[in-house]
Structure formats: structure tokens, C-alpha cells
Amino acid sequence: MRLLRRRHMSLRLAMLGSVFMLFLFIRQKDVSNQEQAMEKPWLKSLAGQKDQVLDFMLGAVNNIRDVMPKLQIRAPEPPQTLVSTNHSCLPGFYTPAELKPFWDRPPQDPNSPGADGKAFQKKEWTNLETKEKEEGYKKHCFNAFASDRISLQRSLGPDTRPPECVDQKFRRCPPLPTTSVIIVFHNEAWSTLLRTVYSVLHTSPAILLKEIILVDDASTDEHLKERLEQYVQQLQIVRVVRQRERKGLITARLLGASVAQAEVLTFLDAHCECFHGWLEPLLARIAEDKTAVVSPDIVTIDLNTFQFSRPVQRGKAHSRGNFDWSLTFGWEMLPEHEKQRRKDETYPIKSPTFAGGLFSISKAYFEHIGTYDNQMEIWGGENVEMSFRVWQCGGQLEIIPCSVVGHVFRTKSPHTFPKGTSVIARNQVRLAEVWMDDYKKIFYRRNLQAAKMVQENNFGDISERLRLREQLRCHNFSWYLHNVYPEMFVPDLNPTFYGAIKNLGTNQCLDVGENNRGGKPLIMYVCHNLGGNQYFEYTSQRDLRHNIGKQLCLHASGSTLGLRSCQFVGKNSRVPKDEEWELTQDQLIRNSGSGTCLTSQDKKPAMAPCNPRDPYQLWLFV
């Protein structure tokens, strides 16, 4: 075959030479002797087809090139660069000029109250000022007096984020999406609300900030009505939309989302301040992955002094969101595997749940996964519901450490619930029934109010949410526990005994007391049948747990009964003898380590030598 190719090679070269000479002849005739060409029809026809002849000649050249013997080793060719099909963006990275904030911050007085994020300080108070401060605390549950005296446009000082965050660059292709910032408020203090708005305007790139939507959840304070409407007119991209009756955070956010015009929805609370470069990392992550629901690193604005906790360059101990089996959101330190996965501070933190107050999400994805459960009422449980839904239905929750936003964390809510706090239990029942499968039993044992709602079928229609779960082909809750939150301790689905532990001698119940997170003495208290501080489980591992929230175990030390974090946490752990208990047939509760039994002495729980004839050593789960 190779010999045949070589014999034909000279013939092909001769043919190519003839074609080339003919083409030159035609070009010469075409240019220098138009009249002669017109006199000879055959030449006129060939000259008119000169472009086709040229194409034929080039094709012949390519054909011969393809059959020429190739070198077996040639210089490496650089890989082809895939050019973006998005012609509306340029290659490379955004420049600082392109990411210029919507508004420049006005000149700052470094000695003004709270300047550069410092604490508000005041040494001497008049009676009138003291009264104003106390009224502010009563109404808002933070120091509104201090907030009112801090500039609405205060600076937060220099950018103290880690160097990799400060130096982070953002690609133009795909372009960073635009965002609508949605802020829900109800009778919010004037200064905290507007400082939140100004903070967004002074830190968000103009090309990315489409609008700020203030959603009023039926505020009654006069300053939040016409005065606010008139004030925001000067802020250009800020507008107010209103709910005429109090419906709560969930429906207010849905209202804001329904009128938002940008590609991404960014939700903030009404008492926040945004740090340098907070927005770009959130939007960049969504540009990479539309299913990412991203939260900033939320730092504290002190509720008393309004001091902003600025980020540090090194050594930040990050937290992530979690939940307990009463379906309460909380924070925990990162597990070791998550620390190892992250190479530097630009890497997102995977989080099993999120606080839900401050986050960004693609508007299209928000709608795809079912927005919020619009049958949930007011506030409570919506963040845990959305956490389960996002993870189980193919998305992911992440915290972006390079994005820093301050938040005033209050110790209690200043607002009343139109239907009382039962709305929280109702919301939690809805999320448990839709997303938790059989694991919902664990929750109902800890919340008797919720369990009663289920028995009475008093939590609304969930058929639409169940249909959503089916349509999205979501994972079950077991998948979530194994793949998203394997560190979560799962109590027995069907514990041996659970409920309150009643002493037959005193007719009182064992009680952990108020705010006992372990280390405090237990007490005896009137049995109230409400669970809570009197809820215990006797497990298949034979430990006695008080595990409404944190997993706490009874342990015996001499004659003392104690409460501490359970030593058995699942695989590769065991129950120590001083946490192991035997519930005997004659109603004693005997500790395996000490051999002593639980008793009530002087109306206090204690340990004593076992005596089945002593009524103060007899106990019953009720």
C-alpha cells in the first residue's frame, strides 16, 4: 500500500502544477486583456469560474498534504482553548474599576460615635437619656439609643479579611449575575434599617446590584410609612413593597422574590452591615454552580455597643449550621474532614443547615426547588425545612468565608406572634411530615405539642409539598444523614423507654433544671407532662439520655448523680460503666459502675445502696 502511494505521488504533483499554471494564466488574461476574454466564449466562461478553480486548487493541496508521510514524533501542540460562546462578556478578570460600589461612602470622622465599626461609648447619662435607652431596649431588644447616634453610613475600617480573600479575582466569563437584595422588616428601628440599606449601597458593585427591595410586614410605626417612602426616593434603586396584614417573614420574602428583577435573590435581615467585598464571592459561587445556596460568614454586631466584629487574617475558627432533634437550628465547629477539604479561605464550607436570615440563591433555582412552603406561618422552622429540601433535592448549602456580613444577634424576639408560638410547632410538623420520613418520630417524642397536632391532623394540607418532593426525585432523610451530616447522632427510633421518670416516694419527676447543658446538679420537680427538662430516654445501649437538644447522659459518681455529654456517640465508641444503667423488674434504676441505685433524698436526686423496699428508690417512666 505504501509503495502504491509513492508511485502516484509524482502524478499528483504534476496534476497540481498544471492546475496552478492554468489558474495563473486565467488571472493574467482576466486582468490584462478583458476585451480578448470577451471575444473567446470558452475563456470567458473559465475566467468567470476563477473562484471555483481556486477552491479546487486549495482542496487539491490539502488532499496531498493529508496523504504525505507524517513524522512519527512532532513538537507538542498546545491544547485548544475553549472560547466562551457568551459574546456579551470579555475574557480575563473584573478590574477594581468595574467592581466600583454603587455609591462612594462620604468622608468619615474617625472620632464620631461607632466610627470604623468601633463600640459606642458614653460615660455620663442624663435621666432623659437613660429613659430613652431603656425604652429602646424594651421595644427593639437592642441598644437603639446607641444605634441612633452612629452614622447611617459609617465605615467599618480597613479590609481585615485574609489575604487570599482581599486578592481574590473574579472571572468575567461567565459573568457575575446581578442580584436583588430583599430586606424584610416589621417595626424596625429607623437607624438599623437604613444603615443596612446604606451598607449595601456602599459595598456592592454597581454593575451587580440591580435593586434593594424593602418588604414591610405590616409595620405600625409611623416613621416606617410615608416618611420611609419619601426618604428612599433619593436612594435611586431602593423601593418599598408592603404586606397590608401581618403574615410574617416567610410570605414577606415570597412577596419580595415575586417582584425581584435580578438573576439572584439575596436576603438580608433589617439589622445588618456588609463588610468589604461581601457580595462578589457569593455571586461568583452561584455563577459556578446554580444549585449552590450560599451564606456569608455572619459576624456579630454587639447589641449593646454596636461594635462590629471584624474578620481576622489568620486563625479563624469557622462554624457551620446544624440542628438537634427538637428541630432547633444551632452552630458547631467544623469536623476535621471539612477542615482538610478546604485549602484556603476562598473555599466554601459545606453546611448541613443554614441560619436562613442571610443568603443568596439563584432566582430560577429558588423557584425550581419550591421557594418556601407558603403554608408555613409567620416565622420558625423555614430555615431547617429549606436546608433539608436543598440537600435532599440535589442542591448544596455553603458558607463563603470571604463574604462577611455583620448581624445584630438579639437574645429574644421583640415581636409577638399573631397566633402565639404554636405557629413554630406547626411549621416544624410540616417540615417533619414532608422531609424526615420515619425519623420524624424522634422529633415528636421531644415536642408533645407537635405530636398532638399530628394526632389531630391540625397542620394544614401538605399534598403539594409531597408532590414537589416526588417531582424533584429527592433523596430520603436517611440519605441526608449518611451523606450530608454523618456526624449527627441518631437516637433510637424506638427507645426501650422514654418520657418523664417519676419517683414513687415523692410523686415528683427527675428534672435537669433550667439551662443545664451538663455539669449542673439535677433536681426533683412537680411532674408537668410537657417533656422538656423532664424528658429522658433509656436506650438500647443502656444509657439514660436527656437529649431534647444536646446528647446528655446520667452518670453516677459516688453518692452523686451527674449530667454530662454522652460518651457513646456511635461507631468506635462505647458506654462507660458509670453511664450504664439497669432498670430492674422491681423498679430500681441501678448504675452498672457503682452498683448503687438512684434515689430521692431530701427532695434531691442521689445515689444510695440498692433497697427495693425503699419507695424513694422506686421509679416509673410516665
From Swiss-Prot:
Disulfide pairings: 509-527, 553-566, 597-610
Binding locations of UDP-N-acetyl-alpha-D-galactosamine: 511, 514, 528, 533
EC number: 2.4.1.41
Spans within the Lumenal topological domain: 29-622
GO molecular-function term, one example from the UniProt record: polypeptide N-acetylgalactosaminyltransferase activity
Residues linked to a glycan: 86, 476
Pathway in which the depicted protein is active: Protein modification; protein glycosylation
Membrane protein topology class: Single-pass type II membrane protein
Residue span, Ricin B-type lectin domain: 506-622
Record key words, sorted: Disulfide bond, Glycoprotein, Glycosyltransferase, Golgi apparatus, Lectin, Manganese, Membrane, Metal-binding, Signal-anchor, Transferase, Transmembrane, Transmembrane helix
Segments on the Cytoplasmic side according to the record's topology features: 1-8
PROSITE patterns: RICIN_B_LECTIN (PS50231)
Family the entry assigns: Belongs to the glycosyltransferase 2 family. GalNAc-T subfamily.
Function, in words: Catalyzes the initial reaction in O-linked oligosaccharide biosynthesis, the transfer of an N-acetyl-D-galactosamine residue to a serine or threonine residue on the protein receptor. May participate in synthesis of oncofetal fibronectin. Has activity toward Muc1a, Muc2, EA2 and fibronectin peptides.
This protein's name: Polypeptide N-acetylgalactosaminyltransferase 6
Species of origin: Mus musculus
Chain's gene name: Galnt6
